[in-house]
Amino acid sequence: MGDKRVVLNKDIFFQRAERLYELWETGQVGLDSVNSIAVAYGDSENPYTKSSALHSWLFGHEINDTALLFLKDHIYILGSNRKVEFFGTVTGVQYNGRVPPVSTLLRDKSDKDAGNFEKLIDYIKRAEGDLGSFVKEKFNSDFVNAWNDALKADDINKTDVSLAFMHLFAVKDDKELELVRKSAQVTTTSWTAARQRYVEIIDSERRVRHSVLSSEFSAYMKDPKIQQSLAKYNADTCYDPIVMSGGNYSFKWNHDNSEAHLHNQFGSIITSFGARLSDYCTNLTRTMLIFPSAELEAAYEAILAAEFAVIAALKPGVKLKDVYKIGVDTLTEKNPKLAETLNKKELGFATGIEFRESRLSINAKCEEVVKEGMVFIVYIGVDSIPNKNKGEKGKPAAIAISDTILVKAEGDNEVLTEKAKSRLKSNVIKFKEEQENRETERDTDQKKLLGRGQRSVVLNDQTRNKTTNEDLRKERQKELGKQLNLNAKARLSKQDGGTDEKKVKKSNVSYKNEERFPQDTDVQKMLIFVDRKYDSVIVPIFGIPVPFHISMIKNCSQSVEGDFTYLRINFATPGSQVGKDNAQFPHPLAHFMKELTFRASNIKEHHSDATPPSSNLSTAFRQIKEMQKRFRTEEAEEREKDGAVKQDKLILSQNKLNPKLKDLLIRPNIIQKRITGSLEAHTNGFRYTSLRGDRIDVLYNNIKHAFFQPCDNEMIILLHFHLKNPVMWGKKKYKDVQFYTEVGEITTDLGKYHHMQDRDDMHSEQQERELRRRLNTTFNSFCEKVSRLTNDQFEFDSPFAGLGFFGVPFRSATTLKPTASCLVNLTEWPPFIVTLSEVELVHFERVSLQLKNFDMVFIFKDYKMKTQMVAQIPMSSIDKIKEWLHTCDIWYSEGIQSLNWAKVMKTITDDPEDFFENGGWTFLDAESEGEDAGDDSDESDAYDPEEADASDGGSSSASDEDESEGEETESDDDEEGSLDSDESEGKDWSDLEEEAAKADKRREVEDGGRDRDRDRDRKRPSSSKAGPSHKRRK
């Protein structure tokens, strides 16, 4: 089991065990005579066995030296002490009445488990019938060999149940498909790096052996720089990556990579590899064509068409032999000669925990039927393809294409490795050679301008097809736009069509009955009385004491004029409060009193009176103010509690090895003093405990997003939890909580003297680097332990620093970084978090060539939510953001103007049917279509350095040019047009940019010379010293 502490996922175990017993009850696929199934597992040279697959499928891990016995009424597990503890969560539990209870037996090594084997064999004999097992599997384990010897000694009749478990493993559940998709992502990411590696090798003409490249590609699976967030899964390879070129090709999966050098001049390079993530396999095979002939390109297209036909034919209910026939027929139709050298053994096979399931092979004899949820590796390989180019008799080439696909009942099957493009133009490498014969003088000038040409690699989709990729992105955006309107219309139609209910102001009754009405002397004397107990003010109106709740009093004021004191009370009435928190009154059509004014004398009426009559007004004024302040504070606390939830009780784990981080600070300042504490993971949540003893609990089921941001290029390292529902801590509710540690010095003494070779500074920098490395390792280890503790149900997401861009989400400029599911800024406070799954669309505002910045607006699927804006994003980031949104399948639009989104969203929510009948969100795309037309016209007037130089030369020396020079310029223009057409076919963007840069630099030099001439003219002596001008000289 390894050194890492693992936990058995109880739910997955019982759900999959239930599937096993359901299949067993049917008595199909060889289980009709089986009354018990025994599986003993140990070390084996073969990594793909049914025994190991059963362990991974049920337990999530391979557990050596254990024996499993499945009976109709019981499950027995034999293992060591530590392994028995692993199964503790499922022992003695009967799940759903279908899975029998589980019991564990502790191994006894003193008698080499003879007693335990005797018990298990006794259970098998009582069950009667045959014993199901994987008969053909062999292990290098004394434990497994002893178990097999014990079965032989008792003459137990065995039946091979491999076919039954093949059917059981073939159809994947949702958890399995999630792992398969991640495995495919690792595979395609590794291919992207491998493809770039081929380009570097061929461009530099390096000699690299096939075996060396195989080792490099294998390392790509675990390289954090390549896999980024997927590196934490520690994916392995399904087999040693296969690299073939130079005529030595084989379609066997156990092919040994030769020590020969990669043939990088012409022909084909075949690469096959696959990732194995959490024991689930995926695979892809790609063929790079180097300087191919037209025949070789046609062969590639035919083989690709055959692969597409096989993928389309893999639908539920279809026999695999029929799928095979469709693939062969398609290739024969496209190119009959290729069908003769096709690898006809099979055109693919099912995959999963086992890389290759031979019983589910796409061949001419397989009678098995395709089912929804199966995962297949489709593989089309053709050998001995003639490869003649440029008169050279090249070695025969081979082409192989493979992808991993998921079978779906409706719609097209999902190609899991689709990101590794298999189309021809993405896998063709051509050379751009220096043209040696230059016939015209203009060609010589052009050569001087561009510099000496060099041989370089040009991927076919690097030049002309870059525009194609942009077109594909636009096409995809159009599809997303159409789907967006359809989905939004359907979603809003399911919701209630009524308008939003306005918030009704709470109706506060001062006294619910007469018994509670106070009988104070002030009330009897018709004076103003402030009742603190019931938050009411009793005032006399026409000789009757009338109570008003403090919530109905808007404000009050007191003034002294002469011998009288005035108290003015203003009441809250409909329409008197303006703002977003304005609430509707319970009875808005009733009659309301707007204000009351009371007057009292400042002079005592009798000498015996202790106070003048106005003292009642002064006392009432003071008490009303105090009561208003207290009531509004209580109201604010009630509003703060609105929407907050009470979390479940944290279940503390008594395990001393719980994941724990120390010396952490917390944001926001839930704890008054800025003191550190520790964060510990428990059974159902986290607990943060400060040094002072303050405790803050965060439960797993209330965490919407969990982020881990390393301290690379940051001053803090942090863990951030974005909650589903706000939680009350103290008297405030919070939806975000962050635990962090500061790294290095945030402030620097600018007055301190520094020397570049100061040993203290060098030592402190080295210490800071070591601290950063240690903190990253510690935090990353904490996240991995939490994932294992929760059986991968709780994972931390990390921002992608390479995709970050600057923007202003609130008041200050920050770096916004995408994650797998969000766009975040966690360093500044308050944090900025946008969940991408909640985003309907993104609109870019103020997009113009004249502006350096633009704004980005997020519109959410819940149209009642306020839109989120990120302002002041540099224009240089717009292409990167568009590509990121495109990969996330989020529709975006752009425009020059800034929109009033509050009014736009109100218009939509008031009448959504009319909005979508008039085109829906396409009104945002109207400007972009017009801009596209403008872009096309701009592209037709593309910049050309020669044309620019010709125009500059003509304007600067028009008076001195003769007719012959003008004729030469015209001829140059004609030649220039032909050059442009050549450039569109051969030059890539990097060359054109270099060409434009050199032309700009040369023109700057010429302009600088003319500027210096003008400066010298300004500094010449005056005419009194230099004599009269030429015009005045006679």
UniProtKB/Swiss-Prot annotation:
SUPFAM superfamilies, per database record: Creatinase/aminopeptidase
InterPro entries reported for this sequence: Creatin/AminoP/Spt16_N (IPR029149), Creatinase/aminopeptidase-like (IPR036005), FACT-SPT16_Nlobe (IPR029148), Fact-SPT16_PH (IPR056595), FACT_SPT16_C (IPR048969), FACT_SPT16_M (IPR013953), Pept_M24 (IPR000994), PH-like_dom_sf (IPR011993)
Pfam families, sorted: FACT-Spt16_Nlob, Peptidase_M24, PH_SPT16, Rttp106-like_middle, SPT16, SPT16_C
Keyword Transcription regulation: yes
Disulphide bridges: none
GO biological process: one example: DNA replication
Region (Disordered): 433-511, 926-1034
Top-level taxon: Eukaryota
Entry's Gene Ontology cellular component terms: FACT complex
Alphabetized UniProt keyword annotations: Chromosome, Coiled coil, DNA damage, DNA repair, DNA replication, Nucleus, Transcription, Transcription regulation
Keyword DNA damage annotated: yes
First-listed, main subcellular location of the protein, grouped into a coarse class: nucleus
Biased composition (Basic and acidic residues): 433-448, 463-481, 493-503, 984-1020
Segments of skewed composition (Basic residues): 1021-1034
Bias type Acidic residues, positions: 926-950, 959-983
Residue ranges of coiled coil: 617-642
Subunit structure: Component of the FACT complex, a stable heterodimer of spt-16 and hmg-3 or hmg-4.
Recorded family membership: Belongs to the peptidase M24 family. SPT16 subfamily.
Name of the molecule in the record: FACT complex subunit spt-16
